[in-house]
């Protein structure tokens, strides 16, 4: 009897002692494992890696401008990263303990900013994340600041930039001929590394290097301009890539990628276009599904997604665009074939989101298999990247010489008729595509 009373008394004493301890013993704090900052020309993204979903509050402060993120019952593990001096929005990042148990992260801002914040669930690459997107309240001032920062010789040398700011200038109206605009899209970026080779080569780095080389070659052609959809290591949502190409009134959209497969012996290049029906193969269907997951990996606020195609009538315009996409893709595939081994000898088709522009012929080029050790090594090689850029340019030039957009320098020379081109396309275009394309004009 007395032993039971003593045991109960001891348990009550232990419980009372635990209740007297600080709150962090009673309830474990959520760990913030670290942060990443992605600096894009028109926005800055700060990502906090959190161990679990967490109550948080985001609010701005003035004089000087700051952004505060308060996280309830949280602690920071490690240090916060430094901020690139070229960032037009954020000048510093710091943290401190608040009210004993909470974590406060403060972002020192260079100017007032629009703020969006949202949490992301875990995926194959990352765990739980808290994302804060900042964009300038005055976009014009931000663009000027970004242009000034990019003009620094040190930064230009570091980025390997060779393009002139004039390459994005608006074409004059009137009787003058306009330039052909090619949107060059480096796949993945920022939070989304894409495929990763056995030696650690990241697809997002390889695609950006090739895209820059291709853009530089396009800009050197008379009557042509390139628009880089991504010109740094930051995330661009798939539909935003389409929107940027359409904003610049591109005549062609080329998305550059590096393929991956479980079998490391698989190798070679492939070229894909949008399908208005089913995929041409299970492999094409699988690849499209993988690439379309980029938004989930890179981080898109699903509550705010707005389909750029929702208000556009796609019927005949989309069909004509797909036809021209296939023709342009065959020209590029032919040049890649002359460079070396191709994985798919015919154009493949599937439902790639990034190719769904209703009025811009679009293609996705898998330059090589980054999962193949030999091809991974070649993809890292600057000389091979140059060869790929040359092949892509050659195919693009062949297409525009045959189908010159009205009002451009290319339109002065002779062009092939759709009927003459159809026979040449039969050997390269996969099932489901038409033979004779309709001519496309900008604005169709």
Predicted features and spans:
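Catalytic-core regions of hydrolytic enzymes
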Residues: 152-307, 318-331, 386, 409-444
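Bacterial N-terminal signal peptides that target proteins for export
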Residues: 1-13
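Active-site-adjacent mobile loop/cap segments within catalytic or ligand-binding domains
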Residues: 69, 262, 313-414, 429, ...
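Structured segments of extracytoplasmic/periplasmic soluble domains
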Residues: 38, 53, 110-112, 137, ...
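Flexible glycine-/small-residue-rich
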Residues: 50-52, 71-73, 109-111, 133-136, ...
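Signal-peptide-cleaved, periplasmic/extracellular N-terminal interaction regions immediately downstream
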Residues: 2, 25-182, 428-431, 436-444
